[in-house]
């Protein structure tokens, strides 16, 4: 309602919303409206509300904005103003020139006569002349500088301590426009001066002591509501370990029925007296001297359900369960390791051979593993190796592995002693035939190997082309799907 009224150009609507009258400067001072003008606005709002309620035809347009609205919506917005409680408050406006308060008279720099009334005592104060506000005035400082009637207010306050000035009346009038009018815009400029003059009687932003003001439906007593919250339980909930929430039986722990003095000192738990749920923190054991244990004999349904769902605690606890810290957990979640792999094997498994563009990835750890098995030390004891080997005099150690050289077999034929020329000639021909046969077989084997290598290379090239064609086909399908084609 106030957002809708704030867009008006009439005097009454802008006084209700406490908005500046000139749109060229939105930071101007709000108008200080007194009780007579508020009564006029009240009568106007009541007459308008009654006319809307008793009208049988459809209400076509919003009188403020010219926007079509229903009757129910207009009535709801008018009911938000709480007109009944505002109108029923006793008022005794004194006849003063402030009843015909002109807008041009206020903004042209002319002084305006304003009258006020104490809302609690029902006594009228004297009318005084209010100086018009100018853009150079600092109206938010709350001081009496620039206000010629400040000394007069101080004299009236000294004579009548309970009596408030018209600015206090203005604050009180604006606080009754609705229950949600706690904005700083509605605070009086002389609020700090009134607080200093009244002394012990504390006045809040609504113009009356907090103990005399009734809380509205839009407000909440924070101090009263915060007492119902178990802040200690929330701290344990936010600071507990993640493992506690995985195991509910460790989080909700029932206190034993019989508690001795020694057990109460050892198994002291922080719990809430209202909820009957004790919160157990596995990381930090609470000291028994500062946190006494509470009796958990609660009849609430939540605590009974927890007692049924959680396992029963032992009658007496002699020793506390060992607390597992984070630095004690040095194993993986999958379980302990059976063997520790070598660092080179771990990192070499990720080394992969690549061809030119897009080829098959072949792990390079298989050949290395076979060679590493040969280089590993055997299961034979050290003293047996020293006894059987010819190099037993060398300083053998567990980290020393002798290098293994490949032994080549000596090729050739052992020439027999010559017998005669015919026998030597036949042996020479046999050796020549054997060499030719071996060369022939070696050439055939080499040819087969080269042919196999050519076939393998051709197959690898064909696989690369196949993958490239598949990628091109998939990209073409995506383009066709973007254009809206249906592809099976």
From Swiss-Prot:
Crosslinked residue numbers (Glycyl lysine isopeptide (Lys-Gly) (interchain with G-Cter in smo-1)): 342
SMART domains: BRLZ (SM00338)
GO cellular component: a single term: mitochondrial matrix
Domain of life of the organism encoding this protein: Eukaryota
Mutant lacking the gene: phenotype: Prevents the up-regulation of several innate immune genes following P.aeruginosa-mediated infection. RNAi-mediated knockdown causes a reduction in survival following P.aeruginosa-mediated infection. Prevents the up-regulation of mitochondrial protective genes and increases the transcription of oxidative phosphorylation machinery and tricarboxylic acid cycle genes following mitochondrial stress caused by RNAi-mediated knockdown of protease spg-7.
InterPro entries per the UniProt record, alphabetical: bZIP (IPR004827)
Biased composition (Low complexity): 142-168
Residue ranges constituting the bZIP domain according to the UniProt record: 420-483
Predominant location: mitochondrion
Gene Ontology biological-process entries: defense response to Gram-negative bacterium; innate immune response; mitochondrial unfolded protein response; positive regulation of gene expression; positive regulation of nematode larval development; regulation of gene expression; regulation of mitochondrial transcription; regulation of transcription by RNA polymerase II
One Pfam family named in its UniProt record: bZIP_2
Signal sequence interval, chain numbering: none
Region (Disordered): 138-191, 353-400
GO molecular function terms attached to this record: DNA-binding transcription activator activity, RNA polymerase II-specific; DNA-binding transcription factor activity; DNA-binding transcription factor activity, RNA polymerase II-specific; enzyme binding; mitochondrial transcription factor activity; RNA polymerase II transcription regulatory region sequence-specific DNA binding
Tissue expression as described in the entry: Ubiquitously expressed.
Subcellular location per the Swiss-Prot or TrEMBL entry: Mitochondrion matrix; Cytoplasm; Nucleus
Keywords: Cytoplasm, DNA-binding, Immunity, Innate immunity, Isopeptide bond, Mitochondrion, Nucleus, Transcription, Transcription regulation, Transit peptide, Unfolded protein response
Region called Leucine-zipper, residue ranges: 462-469
Family: Belongs to the bZIP family.
Physiological role: Acts as a transcription factor during mitochondrial stress by activating the mitochondrial unfolded protein response (mtUPR). Induces nuclear and mitochondrial gene transcription, including genes coding for mitochondrial chaperones and proteins involved in glycolysis, amino acid catabolism and innate immunity. Following mitochondrial stress, restores mitochondrial respiratory capacity by limiting the transcription of oxidative phosphorylation (OXPHOS) machinery genes and by promoting the assembly of OXPHOS complexes via the up-regulation of chaperone and assembly factor genes.
Designated name of the protein: Stress activated transcription factor atfs-1
Gene: atfs-1
């Amino acid at each position: 309602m106030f957002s809708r009224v704030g867009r008006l150009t009439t005097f009454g609507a802008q006084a209700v919303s406490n908005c500046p009258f000139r749109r060229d400067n939105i930071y101007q001072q709000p108008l200080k409206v007194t009780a007579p003008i508020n009564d006029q606005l009240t009568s106007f709002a009541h007459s308008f509300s009654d006319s809307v309620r008793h009208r049988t035809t459809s209400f076509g347009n919003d009188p403020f904005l010219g926007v079509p609205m229903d009757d129910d919506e207009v009535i709801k917005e008018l009911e938000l103003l709480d007109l009944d409680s505002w109108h029923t408050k006793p008022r005794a406006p004194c006849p003063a020139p402030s009843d015909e308060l002109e807008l041009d008279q206020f903004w042209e720099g002319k002084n305006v006569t304003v009258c006020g009334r104490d809302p609690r005592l029902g006594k009228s104060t004297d009318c005084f002349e209010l100086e018009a506000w100018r853009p150079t005035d600092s109206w938010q400082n709350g001081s009496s500088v620039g206000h010629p009637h400040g000394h007069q207010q101080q004299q009236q306050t000294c004579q009548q301590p309970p009596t408030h000035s018209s600015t206090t009346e203005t604050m009180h009038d604006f606080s009754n426009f609705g229950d949600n009018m706690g904005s700083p815009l509605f605070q009086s400029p002389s609020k700090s001066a009134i607080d200093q003059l009244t002394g012990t009687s504390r006045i809040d932003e609504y113009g009356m002591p907090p103990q005399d003001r009734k809380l509205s439906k839009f407000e909440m007593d924070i101090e009263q509501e915060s007492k119902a919250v178990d802040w200690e339980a929330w701290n344990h909930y936010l600071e507990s370990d993640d493992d506690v929430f995985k195991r509910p039986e460790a989080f909700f722990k029932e206190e034993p029925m019989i508690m001795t003095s020694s057990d109460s000192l050892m198994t002291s738990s922080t719990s809430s007296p209202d909820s009957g749920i004790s919160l157990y923190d596995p990381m930090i054991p609470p000291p028994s001297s500062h946190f006494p244990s509470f009796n958990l004999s609660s009849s609430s349904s939540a605590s009974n359900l927890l007692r049924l769902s959680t396992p029963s605690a032992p009658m007496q606890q002699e020793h506390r369960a060992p607390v597992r810290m984070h630095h004690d957990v040095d194993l993986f979640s999958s379980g302990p390791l059976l063997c520790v792999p070598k660092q080179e094997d771990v990192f070499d498994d990720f080394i992969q051979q690549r061809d030119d563009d897009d080829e098959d990835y072949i792990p390079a750890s298989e050949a290395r593993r076979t060679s590493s098995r040969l280089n590993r030390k055997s299961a034979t004891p050290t003293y047996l190796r020293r006894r059987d080997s010819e190099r037993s005099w060398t300083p053998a150690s567990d980290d020393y592995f002798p290098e293994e050289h490949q032994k080549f077999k000596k090729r050739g034929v052992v020439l027999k002693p010559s017998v005669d020329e015919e026998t030597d000639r036949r042996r020479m021909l046999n050796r020549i035939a054997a060499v030719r046969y071996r060369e022939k077989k070696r050439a055939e084997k080499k040819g087969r190997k080269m042919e196999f290598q050519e076939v393998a290379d051709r197959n690898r090239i064909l696989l690369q082309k196949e993958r490239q064609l598949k990628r091109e086909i998939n990209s073409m399908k995506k383009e066709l799907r973007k254009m809206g084609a249906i592809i099976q």
